[in-house]
Regions:
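Dinucleotide-binding Rossmann-like beta1-alpha1 core, especially the glycine-rich loop
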Residues: 1-62, 183
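Generic secondary-structure signature for well-ordered alpha-helical cores
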Residues: 4, 8-11, 15, 46-49, ...
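Helix-loop-beta segment of a Rossmann-like dinucleotide-binding subdomain
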Residues: 15-26, 40, 60-99, 121-125
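Core Rossmann-like FAD-binding/catalytic domain of the broad FAD-dependent monooxygenase superfamily
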Residues: 40, 45, 51-54, 59-66, ...
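Short aromatic/basic micro-patch
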Residues: 52-53, 82, 103, 128
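A conserved short coil-to-beta-strand element within the FAD-binding core of flavoproteins
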Residues: 54-58, 63, 102-120
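Flavin-dependent oxidoreductases
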Residues: 112-183
Length: 183
């Protein structure tokens, strides 16, 4: 769904989201993560995505730097990739503007209230805004923003770790391939 949406937003906005498909896999080193990957694959299949389990030997072929003996299960996603977060944000904002929408930066939403006619009053730190439609663009704070409208969003921010190093020739030689995710 998301990849199709990115293409549509790029077309409507004329702005690239910077999508770089490279394929990627998810690795499970314990039973809890194995069960999680099985559930994720079931959801992906239901949505028509081509994720598939691959052998640990195939993992080694796709990424020779990985020791497959540490893992129990591997899930391959052929359309996995990366986007430019600022590009996605700008493309969505521009597409909204093309369709008559407005967006406000550096404006904290304090509360929202739906009126009987279906429109919304949005109370911000810079004054009140009336809108026919509101879009939750809260990012990491989407759950909290949703609560302002009485909506419980099942969004859970996840912590990821990043490591900055000098160039590693073996990783550079892999090109654009994403490094695996898992535990």
């Amino acid at each position: 769904y998301t990849i199709g949406l990115y293409k549509e937003i790029e077309k409507e906005s004329g702005h690239s989201v910077g999508f770089k498909p490279s394929g990627g896999f998810y690795l499970a080193s314990n039973d809890v993560w194995s069960e999680y990957l099985k559930r994720e694959r079931s959801k992906a299949r239901y949505m028509g995505l081509d994720q598939e389990f691959i052998s640990l030997d195939e993992v080694k072929k796709k990424n020779p730097l990985i020791d497959p003996s540490r893992y129990l299960l591997a899930l391959w996603d052929p359309i996995d990739g990366e986007v430019d977060p600022s590009g996605v944000t700008y493309a969505f904002a521009k597409a909204a503007k093309v369709h008559g929408g407005k967006y406000y930066t550096h404006t904290e939403v304090k509360d929202t209230k739906q009126k009987p006619d279906g429109s919304w009053d949005v109370f911000t730190d810079k004054g009140n805004i009336n809108a026919e439609i509101i879009i939750n663009a809260g990012g990491l704070w989407a759950r909290e923003v949703g609560k302002l409208s009485g909506i419980d969003l099942p969004v859970q921010p996840m912590e990821h770790h990043y490591l900055i190093t000098e160039a590693i020739p073996e990783i550079e030689a892999m090109g654009e391939q994403r490094l695996p995710i898992g535990t």
